[in-house]
Amino acid sequence: MARKPRFAPGGLAYHVMNRTSSGITLFEDSPDFEAFERVLVEGLAREPGVRLCAYCLMPNHFHLVLWPKSDGQLSRFMQWLSMTHAARWHAHRHTGGRGHLGE
């Protein structure tokens, strides 16, 4: 079940961290990291008002520093990024998971 979006006013920088719910390895090798970077670039193209200031990818989580221009953009961007990455991750591994990673 999706969580209620947080209010995140535009014009401010936000540190966002996302990890798997069960601590599973999210990024096993270079192609996994590169696949996430492609999804990240695609998401930024979909929400042109969101600026990526910095990012760090770890084996079981990632950190982003994002600067949304408008109110509500951060939630929309993170929802799309999380759901798209999870769907592609499950499809690549032929797992039956639905929703967030680690289910």
Whereabouts are the PLM-identified features?
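Short catalytic/metal-binding and nucleic-acid-binding patches
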Residues: 1-103
